[in-house]
């Protein structure tokens, strides 16, 4: 069992089970990730592994990162991510994490950036109820009160108001793996996943 892997969302389609029911699925291209650093409670205060993903030419990487990658014999990565692990001793610098570490039926936690939908009002963004549409009402889609007057005399931080909808970090829990292709480095997961095609997804195994 592996800690996790990073991949790119390909898109959605549907497959059919033995009973003929259509199941919506998402395809993820998960190229091998390399272990670039091993963190332990003794040295860093917690147990985790750092992996590199999205290969990049060394000429396009800063000198400090090049020195960091030389320790694990890496050819170069553009991005890095961490996965918490219970036993970091089982990993070695330079180890490759591939789709072969996952199995059909395994439940994983998928994190990505949701699709940005621009500026939106309260009803679309926060599911507020609208006001009366007739009988002389002038409050159709207004937000209503946003706080009291003299006390506190300000709008509390975090007040639900109109603003940027989407483009936020989103996590899908208990997403089930339905198919694993070791040759093509593809995972097929049940249901939808955050973001649009080519979005980077963090797939973490349930501990």
Curated annotation (Swiss-Prot):
**Location in or out of the cell:** Plastid, Chloroplast
Instruction: Tell me one GO molecular function of this protein.
Output: structural constituent of ribosome
Xref: SUPFAM superfamilies: Translation proteins
Q: Which GO terms describe its biological process?
A: translation
What keywords would UniProt list here?
Chloroplast, Plastid, Ribonucleoprotein, Ribosomal protein, RNA-binding, rRNA-binding
Q: Quaternary form?
A: Part of the 50S ribosomal subunit.
Q: Which family does it belong to?
A: Belongs to the universal ribosomal protein uL3 family.
What's its job? One of the primary rRNA binding proteins, it binds directly near the 3'-end of the 23S rRNA, where it nucleates assembly of the 50S subunit.
Query: What name does the UniProt record give this protein?
Result: Large ribosomal subunit protein uL3c
The gene for this chain is rpl3
């Amino acid at each position: 069992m592996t800690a996790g892997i990073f991949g790119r969302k390909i898109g959605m389609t549907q497959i059919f089970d033995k009973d003929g029911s259509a199941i919506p699925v998402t395809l993820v291209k998960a190229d091998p990730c390399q272990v670039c650093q091993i963190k332990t409670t003794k040295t860093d205060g917690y147990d985790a592994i750092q992996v590199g993903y999205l290969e990049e030419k060394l000429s396009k990487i800063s000198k400090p990162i090049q020195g960091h990658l030389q320790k694990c014999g890496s050819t170069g990565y553009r991005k890095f991510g961490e996965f918490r692990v219970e036993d970091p001793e089982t990993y070695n610098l330079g180890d490759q994490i591939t789709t072969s570490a996952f199995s059909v039926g395994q439940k994983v936690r998928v994190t990505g950036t949701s699709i940005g939908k621009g500026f939106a009002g309260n009803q679309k963004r926060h599911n507020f109820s609208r006001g009366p549409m007739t009988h002389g009402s002038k409050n159709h889609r207004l937000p209503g009160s946003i706080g009291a007057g003299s006390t506190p005399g300000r709008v509390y931080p975090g007040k639900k108001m109109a603003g940027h909808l989407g483009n936020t970090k989103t996590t899908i829990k208990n997403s089930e793996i339905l198919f694993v292709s070791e040759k093509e480095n593809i995972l097929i997961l049940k249901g939808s996943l955050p973001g649009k095609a080519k979005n980077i997804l963090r797939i973490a195994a349930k501990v």
